[in-house]
Amino acid sequence: MADNYLEKRYEEVFGAGAAGHSKKRGGPSLNTLLVRNRSTRRFRTDAEVSIEHLRTIVEVNTRIASAMNRQTLRFGIVRKEDDPAAYGRLRDLYVHGQDWRIPPSSFIVVFSTLPEGRFIDIDLGISLQSMSLKAVELGYNCLMIGRNTAEELAEAYSAGDPARAASIAGLHPLVFLAVGKADQSAFLKPVSLADAPLDESGHPAPGFLAYYDKDGVHYVPKLVLEDILL
């Protein structure tokens, strides 16, 4: 066989320069992921998130920054299919009496090995945003839920199972993350403080930056750069 036969044949089929130079496709830019990363309150009921994808989402925490590199955060994955009891209790916390909320089929519960404090909260914010961006990259959306007490969250995750309760003994529940396929459209709406209605004290009126739904679209007002840059 002639020298370089395979390389020459590859070039004939795929074009000159193709051999030895596989073309890499770039993924979505950070700006694209940020725009797609919208809080979702209505999820598709027919879409499940695989355990592999959930592990991939949690895995970003092995690469992100951590205050003093303490790496105190721990994560519990709960899927409707695998953990129906815990899922049911977390679903109830998610809906919170608001029937228009449609829960996803999976949650990620975040715990800490240390009591909540300033640096734990900084780590938590980095973690939640990073996991949400990874979820978006995989085709999902998220919602961060932090209104519940630590006791409520621990109770929901344990779901009356002594083994599950033992697995989180000594940990401090923080928040949980809903992960699924969005069943709503979201749109960022640039707004300026110069256009804001003012209250009696001269400050922007309450509700100026509140998100809202209109004609099936979820609108999220965001201040323009000129308003946040000092």
Q: Can you say where each PLM-predicted feature lies in the sequence?
A:
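Acidic, surface-exposed loops and disordered segments
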Residues: 1-230
